[in-house]
Amino acid sequence: MKFKKKNIYWVSPTKGVESMGCGLVKEFPCKDIGSIIDKITPNVSTIINLMEGVYRGNFSYLMTNFVILFKGEGRDKTIIDLEGRQRFTLCTISDIHFKDLTIKNGFGNAISGIFDGGAIYAYDSQIHFVNVALIDNTCSASGGGIFLYNCYFNVEHSLFQNNTANSGGGFILLLSASNITNSSFLHNRVFQEGKGGAIQVFISFMSIELSLFAYNIAPYSGAIDMVGGNLTSKYSKFIENHSNIGGGFGLYFISNVIFESCEFIGNRANSTGGLSFLTAQSMLRFSLCIFKDNFAPNCGIVESHSISPLLFESCSFTGDVPTAVQIALYDNYCFLKVQNCHFSEIQGVLMYADSISNIIIDSSSFTNVSNRIIDVGNEADILIISSTFYNITIDEYLVSLSNGNFLAYNMDFNNNIVLALIKSSVGGSVTIVSSSMSNNYVSTSLISLSNGYSVYIENCEVKNNTGLFKGCFIDTDHTGSETIVQSLFENNRSPFGPILYFSNPETMLSTNYSSNFRDILFSNNFAAYSGALVYFSQNVSLPNISCTNCIYDNNTAVFGELVNSAFYSFNVSITPVIYPFQDLIIEIFALDFFGNLVRGTSDLGFFAIPCSDAYVEGNLFAVLNENGSAIFSNIKLSSNPNSICNLTFLSVPIVSENGPITIPITFSYCSQDRELVMIKSIYYCLKTIKVTSFVKFLVGTLAAILLIILIISGFISLKYRKKRVIRYSNPLFLCIILVGCIIFLITIPVLFGSTSATCKIRFPIIVIGSCLVTSSVFIKQFRIWRLIKDIQLLRETNVENKYLLKFISILMVIPIIIVICSFFIFPTHEKYTFNQRDITITHYCSDGSYLAYVIIFLVYQMAILLFGCYLVIVCRKFRSIPGTFNEATYIGILIYNYTVVLIVAIPLAYVFNKNPLANFLIFSISIIVFVLSTIILLFIPKFHFLLRKKVIISSLEKLIKEQEAIVQRNKDILYFYDMYLAEERTGIQQQQRQGNLYNNNSLGRSISSNTRKRSNNNINNNNNNNSFNMTGFSDSSSTISNPNLTSFTSSPSSLNSSSDSDSTPDFNDPNFLEYYNERVKNYGKRKSIEKNKINNSIPNSPKSTTSLPTSLPSSSSSSSSSSSSSSSSSSSSSSSSSITPKSNTPILSPSSQSSKTINKGGSGSGNSSSIPNYQNIKSPNTPKSNKSSPNLSIPVNKNSKVSKLSSNQISSPKSIKSDKSPITIKDFDNSSDLSDSSNSLKSDSSIGSEQFNEKVINRIFNIHQDKKVKTTKQQSDSTLSSIGSDSSPNFNENINNPNINPNNNNNPNNNNNNNNNNNNNNNNNNNINNNNNNANNNNSDTDDSSPNFNENIEKKNVVKTKTNFLNQFHQKKQKDSDNRKNYNISPINISDEKVPPLSPINLSKRK
């Protein structure tokens, strides 16, 4: 506004003065505005320049016909503070302008209810605000900042903030006009029940542009309240205004409001109309607006009660704020149009109408909404044109109408997961044209219709939709009509009826409507249960479905056809004739209206109601399964045979259209494998439990095979009864065993069934068969034990048939008594037991005394067999010689087997007596094992021995060769030991020349008690070898030839001691001592004879030959006697071998040496020690004739732990220890100084060339010299160790022949053996005499000894150097090598390891 003629005044609260001439110039301003107002002339334009400062004082100016411009220097500089007690002005018919200033803290009281406004009250005036701030003004009535009545109010770039009133917090416009541009209304407030937190308009016109309304609060209409008038708002924002109703604005009484390009964000209402509330024909239009997060519990955006249109054009709706409805139409004839809008992420029902309303949606899109889009009722009409619904996931219907009409054209429903797209009820009509529905997941169907409807579908595509629970496209109760033309249905899936799903109507409306299809293509539609296209649920009325020009392509249902219905009727399948208590299987088939099975469902059940005179057991209710049938299983009916019972069947919860079904059942007699039994007035047909035919056939076949084997075994035993292997086993014994086994096998067919006859004879047969076998075997084992005992006591050992039969008769007394009692006195009878649960009956054999029979029989058998086991243990160490049949071993195993079988079988058979199959298998398997073990252990080995005689002889020959190798190996080891005892031999030879060799007292002292005891045991064992044994045998005609052996004869001795037994004679035994003394007395007499024989056999023996002793010590005599005894017994009782060397072969024999007494350092007496000497006697002039050559006999005894050599050949150096010699065998065994040397000696078990490590010999020589020096200092106090002492090993145990038997002459069974022994003794005595003669000749030339190893070591004064020692050793070994070549025995290879001990010769070893 321009002032042509104006008055200008200046006012300054700080520089102004109070004078008459003030204010006319800027330099002399007035201090108070009121002084200027008094000077102003009405209707004269006046400018009042308000200089910087805060103006306070008394205002409330009354201005009429004033034209004034209040101009300040800025809103922050020029401030009019009304101090909360006054208004600034009350103006009428004036034109007041405010610019660049702030008016605050105004307060207005209503004057007679007319004058309101906290800062300004204007009437018939014009008020202009330019860059004005109206702040913190309050009015007790209306218009917290300004009240305008019939005024024009222009606002530019101004601020209304924190103004309060009972209504119109910012200002009130009454019958006025206002233009607001670029202004802000912030935090204005209305109290009590007022309206319009920022502006209240009464029948006025207002235009708002580029303004902001934010955070204004009022009970109603949070920002703008409009009662009549027009409001146009452009490019403005309404943000977070708050009220109870109409959070942004409220329109009442024919208001017309247009918002263009506005934003409505976060406006809230406590009740409804979060953004706007419309009543009374108010029209609201939004164009290009944005709605976001507006909220109210009932209606979030607009609630309309106006019949005027509500229009949304090109708007966007977003916001995830929970609310019931976004846009609501509550009055009749409301109209809503949504055009080209986009809705996304909206909660609550988007559009709701509960009355006769019209909703039009044109070219809009809906996505990601969380509730229904349209929900209308009461004849509301919905028109959707060219709109899309996609990516919506809700558990609601997208469009729901009740008694309304739905029309859609060019609509797309894609990728939605909803309860249904369209829900129409109560007479609704649905018309869809040229639309598409694809890739949707629906819980019920795409279109759900009920309670009177009509649906028309034309030119639509329904593809790839999935129905989750019912159908897929249309779900209807068949109370309306369906018309579908020129459409495509492809790849739709649902459990039932993908195209049409007819459910049961909820009302009594007629279902006589038609379903018409024309020009339809049905392709690849699929039903997971029934109805590939159409399905009728629950009760079905007469369907009237027609399809004209329809094409069906690959439409399938898992449990149905193209058209199926729910349950309609059922049929019953049952056996009309049954026997009492038969397992009855009843099957019911559920059918649909079209006669197809109702499959794929289990919501139907059936009851069976029996007749009153029959007994019923089982479940009388069955549930329909997926294959369309219900089965009653485990039902048992029982009644008197030839009676009839009626069974009635009915369905629940759906009653069949045909009603219940009754079927008669006839009872017959039992079948062949069952027995009729009445228990507690109930008839049962019980199944007989018995052994299956297959088991009978299998076990019977095995028994027959065993019977054939037994017969063949008996035939072979009789045919070869004169053979020693059969004869020694006693053919009668074998026949009794065969008879017992055959009787035992007869039990198996008796066990096939339990009848009175089989029960009576079953137990006696078992007792007789088993006792015959076990008693015979026990008597055999007992006789073996007695045989061993008789041999030890030198009694009669022959076994006679009479003896066998006598004891079998004795042992069979108790079994015969048991048989008589169980067969005649208290026989077992057939009994039975039944199982009502399994409907079975079991026959078994039992009696009151049955358990007593079993216990007595078991105790008796166990007593015999356990005693037999004891006898087996006692006799376990007795084994047969190689090449003989050891029957005792097999008898022992057989007794063990019988014991185990009877211990296991009898108790188990009693426990399972009432189980036919188990009882039969236990008995049958036990009998088969019993008989089979008897055949395997008693007959097969004998037949095998008969057929494999040559193989056994070859095995023996190989065994003897191995023993020869061990003998030669022991000889070489003894040679090695002799090298370190050579020094001691010189002293011993001197003692021999003094005649101390025959000192019996020293010999007696040298023999240990343990040696004597072991010798006595071996004597007894050898007595057993000389005895006859019926359990062991060998072929007397078989002779094993060997190039190195003269002869080998097997003897039938089989009960020999084990290989672990000792063979040294016991010198404490009086029998042995008496025999020993007798041999010593006769030794002198034989000496001359032996000397002559030796001279005759070696006439040209040179003097240089090593001399043999002229006489032997007691130990040598004893050994000679033992050797003689062993040689004599080798032909009759034990296996021995004789090696006959060639004519020029040197003879290996021990040199008899006398003991020598050594006194050193005074009168102390020395101890005597006897050390044998082992030499190879080379006789180059010995004739080649075998008769004149002395024989080297190596008797072999299988009882000894090591090889047994006669004392004429080998004496042990291990039992000799001299105080003069620093090295003994004991030293080698125990000395730590020699441990390295011992460990460096290595023995090779193979027979090859002999080698020695000189490093080992050097170490041994050095240790020998060191120990000699040490022992020389202790010679005066040392004593000689006795021969065979307990502290050192006694080699006499290994070489003493244990075959000396002083009681041989007293045994009448051994007369022949004694004669043979005497002959052998004579031969051995001749050999001894020859050896003694050689020894005498050699002794006579001892001083003139030949240059051999012994002559060199006799020179005491010669210093023994290492070189001499090695030379002597090599000379000695060279002679040994030559001797072995003459005997055809390869030398032993001795390497750097420890020298092994003497290896035992064990003839008990067998392949």
Swiss-Prot record:
Segments crossing the lipid bilayer? 697-717, 732-752, 759-779, 807-827, 854-874, 891-911, 920-940
Q: PbH1 repeats at which positions?
A: 93-118, 129-150, 254-279, 452-476
* Coiled-coil region list: 1315-1344
Instruction: Specify the signal sequence span.
Output: none
Which GO molecular function annotations are given, in alphabetical order?
Answer: G protein-coupled GABA receptor activity
Family to which the UniProt record says this protein belongs: Belongs to the G-protein coupled receptor 3 family. GABA-B receptor subfamily.
Q: What is the name of this protein?
A: Metabotropic glutamate receptor-like protein P
Q: Which organism is it from?
A: Dictyostelium discoideum (Social amoeba)
